[in-house]
């Protein structure tokens, strides 16, 4: 099944104050976030990728053009010829499509549609979130349904509380977001080709197309309480990077057993994740009074860290 990866959004500035890079190219261990997402799909046998590119397209394309299999695989040099003993992407097919800078996700999907061929089913992903969700089960459940799209539904990630306010502005209830019976869109989609007929020019995928289809009962959710983590904040990126460097990556199903301990509303965070989060929290606490940019990012100080 082909996999469309939406990797055309604007870049982000790293903690070290370096230049902006496309979010999918943020390093997680010794490989970009995008590589980890693709490796997850390849683990389940899905190795045809369509990259819907925009901002940072040159960096993304260059990374794969210059890909070095010996960077993370054992190899032999024989009479001057380098021969990797194992490979990561040698059997992948990657199509690179420029879809614009300011383009909404739905429009990006419209622009790569010709590359999907006549396949009845395909998958899509925001290319900036990692999980250990059972992809085979997600696909099987969707294929057996009459839905046009399926999305991974994860517990709320916010640590905030919500309040019930009456007409006199009195608070009648306070609730933790994490305990509410709601789910967030986890960014892992399975779709039928028919969905493409519902895409309108210049519209968003979730906010427009899937919202309308859900009202008609044509969108399926796969609730999942296991490991799921985006890379939207500095804290999240640091946690993912540290887990990868320590070889404790729950999402790396190709090299580690599936982490079956649920994460979310009803279960504690796995120890390896909690340990890293605690360390990052300590750093963030120490930066509480540090100078920040207009967008809230900490301006690094010469602190020796």
Which positions does each model-derived feature cover?
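Well-ordered alpha-helical segments embedded in enzymatic catalytic cores
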Residues: 33-36, 108-111, 209
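N-terminal glycine-rich phosphate-binding loop and ensuing alpha1 helix
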Residues: 1-62, 66, 96, 270-277, ...
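Catalytic-core segments of class I nucleotidyltransferases/pyrophosphorylases
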Residues: 120-123, 130-143, 155-158, 170-269, ...
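Conserved beta-loop-beta/alpha segment of the NTase-like Rossmann-fold superfamily
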Residues: 59-167
């Amino acid at each position: 099944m082909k996999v469309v990866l939406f990797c055309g959004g604007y870049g982000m500035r790293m903690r070290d104050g370096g230049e902006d890079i496309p979010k999918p190219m943020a390093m997680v261990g010794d490989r970009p976030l995008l590589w980890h997402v693709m490796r997850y799909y390849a683990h389940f046998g899905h190795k045809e990728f369509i990259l819907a590119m925009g901002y940072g397209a040159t960096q993304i394309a260059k990374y794969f053009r210059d890909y070095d299999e010996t960077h993370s695989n054992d190899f032999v040099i024989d009479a001057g010829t380098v021969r990797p003993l194992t490979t990561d992407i040698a059997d992948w097919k990657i199509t690179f499509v420029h879809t614009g800078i300011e383009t909404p996700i739905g429009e990006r999907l419209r622009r790569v549609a010709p590359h999907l061929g006549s396949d009845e089913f395909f998958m899509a992903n925001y290319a900036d979130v990692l999980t250990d969700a059972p992809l085979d089960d997600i696909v099987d459940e969707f294929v057996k349904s009459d839905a046009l799209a399926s999305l991974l539904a994860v517990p709320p990630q916010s640590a905030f509380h919500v309040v019930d306010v009456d007409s006199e502005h009195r608070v009648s209830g306070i609730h933790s977001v994490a305990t509410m019976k709601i789910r967030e869109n986890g960014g892992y989609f399975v779709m039928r080709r028919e969905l493409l007929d519902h895409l309108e020019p210049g519209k968003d995928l979730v906010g427009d197309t899937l919202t309308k289809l859900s009202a008609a009962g044509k969108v399926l959710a796969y609730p999942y309480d296991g490991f799921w983590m985006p890379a939207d904040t500095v804290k999240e990126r640091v946690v993912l990077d540290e887990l990868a460097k320590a070889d404790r990556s729950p999402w790396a199903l190709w090299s580690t057993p599936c982490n079956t301990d649920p994460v979310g509303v009803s279960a504690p965070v796995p120890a390896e994740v909690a340990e890293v989060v605690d360390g990052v929290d300590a750093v963030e606490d120490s930066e509480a009074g540090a100078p920040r940019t207009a967008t809230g990012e900490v301006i690094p100080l010469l602190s020796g860290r």
